[in-house]
Amino acid sequence: VEAAKRGARVTAVDLSATLISIARERLPSHIGQGSIDFRVGDMSSMELGEFDHVVAMDSLIHYDVADGIRVLAGLADRVRGSILFTHAPSTVLLELMHASGKLFPRGDRSPAIQPVSERRLQKMIARERCLQRWHRGRMQRINRGFYISQACELLPG
């Protein structure tokens, strides 16, 4: 919404039709000169076209780490500017929470995440051919109560 308020044409994608519906309902009546095109689908779909920037907030945390890197690589071929994404950092607290979550019956658990250390993530990014022209930009740890993630920026060049 903030990008649209600043004039951007935003494509908002999620696999969940329910979440897209909620996002549409919560959209403010006035978003300035920009626009938001809500779509149910896979953010890695080539049909979405090219982008100036990509923000994958809490999307890749639900992928196996290697699959998440492949998604980033696929996006990188279609992005002219930056890629911002979050991942679940490998911390003692998060590893304990992740392990204890496995004790509950499957229906009572939140969606699976796979914590990964920053070092391992950066090595995997560096080894991915399609990401070799990209370099790490800003990094920011987000820690709010039980929510922990690591925001990462990839920049071309």
Predicted regions and their residues:
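Class I SAM-dependent methyltransferase SAM/SAH-binding core
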Residues: 1-45
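A conserved beta-strand element that flanks and buttresses the S-adenosyl-L-methionine
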Residues: 55-56
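Hydrophobic adenine-recognition pocket in adenosine-nucleotide-binding enzymes
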Residues: 59
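A short, conserved alpha-helix within the catalytic core of class I
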Residues: 63-75
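Conserved beta-strand signature within the Rossmann-like core of class I S-adenosyl-L-methionine
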Residues: 79-89
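Short, glycine-/aromatic-enriched active-site segment of Class I SAM-dependent methyltransferases
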Residues: 94-111
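Short alpha-helix
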Residues: 111-131
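Core SAM-dependent methyltransferase catalytic element
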Residues: 137-157
